[in-house]
Amino acid sequence: MSNPPSKLYIGLMSGTSLDGVDAALVSIQNGELELKAFQTFPYTDNLKKQLHHLNQTPHVDLKALCDMEYQVANAFSEATQQLLDNCDHVASDIRAIGSHGQTIFHAPDIPMSLQIGHPAFIAKNTGITTVADFRIDDMANNGQGAPLAPAFHQKLFGNTVGTAVVNIGGISNITFLDQQKTLGFDTGPGNGLMDEYCEQFFNCSYDADGKMAQTGQVNMALLSDLMQEPYFRLPAPKTTGKDLFNSDWLNPFLAKYSNVSKKDILSTLNQLTVDTIIQGLNTLPSQPKRLLICGGGAENKTLISRLQAQLSYPVKTTQSVGVPPHAIEAMMCAWLAEQRLNNTPIALQHITGATKDSVLGAVWHP
């Protein structure tokens, strides 16, 4: 009699902030998820620099792209092995890895989405079955391929009707858990523009706790100009990324407002994230009863306090309901792997605009 499959999965995620690899060890049994361990393994400075360049360069050298594909796969493999070592597990304990990869280009209008960090290398390097390439099946069914997070938010928080979940990574997205259907879409910039501005002008990778933004003043003229971006007025379903909201998008505004102090600009970028989230919340079919925040933006106290100041309902991080804000997307990847191995379609029609729900991802064996 064969042994039952392991209930343990590893989820690997690197978002548009390009911080490194988020790795989650997740138990999934009888439809219930339990986070066993979570760690972030930072990219090397050199790899991060190369990925930033690749992410903002639509015309790339194929050799450089293949080199990055290989390097990111190795980074994901090393993160897996370190997580296993730190948790006293071995490869045979794990049923599968769910690897999102590193998004380099996402273009629903083509439609195509490119994530690098080839899963064949991850599977062979770790000795663990690897599930990846989650977005393209949805796009093949006329969906936007993003955001995927709302489907997982439904899984985690689906019994809390009237909850809105906002994931603030490099880009922000909203999930609204409603009795009729789950809605979700990208609102616009999250931490991405602020992080790039900090790297360029403050010699740091991000604004810790939003402290620098708090000391600045919002420049209302600049904010008004930023808010004219056509994406903000598009109806859902919609998705965006760093291919739009990057330094190339921001630089013309910086040139126009060159007399504005750096801290005031950072404060204004913080408010841009707040206002575009509020704008997205205002398009929902009914007012949420509460707002849960996850992603790196959950640590930006200035951003959170500004959101709460403009909303009449409670704003809390997902930690308040027992789920670490940083771990959710990596947990999602573990769940997507389990769903793929069970051939379970993911309900995305009301989120991405797909014509039918899809079984997401492909499988690579060790």
From Swiss-Prot:
Q: Which major enzyme category is it?
A: transferase
Q: What is its EC number?
A: 2.7.1.170
Q: Which InterPro entries match?
A: Anhydro_N_Ac-Mur_kinase, ATPase_NBD
Molecular function (Gene Ontology), one example? ATP binding
The organism's place on the tree of life at top rank: Bacteria
Q: Which residues bind ATP?
A: 15-22
Role played: Catalyzes the specific phosphorylation of 1,6-anhydro-N-acetylmuramic acid (anhMurNAc) with the simultaneous cleavage of the 1,6-anhydro ring, generating MurNAc-6-P. Is required for the utilization of anhMurNAc either imported from the medium or derived from its own cell wall murein, and thus plays a role in cell wall recycling.
What the record says about family reads: Belongs to the anhydro-N-acetylmuramic acid kinase family.
Q: What is the protein named?
A: Anhydro-N-acetylmuramic acid kinase
Q: Mind giving the lineage of the organism this protein is from?
A: Bacteria, Pseudomonadati, Pseudomonadota, Gammaproteobacteria, Thiotrichales
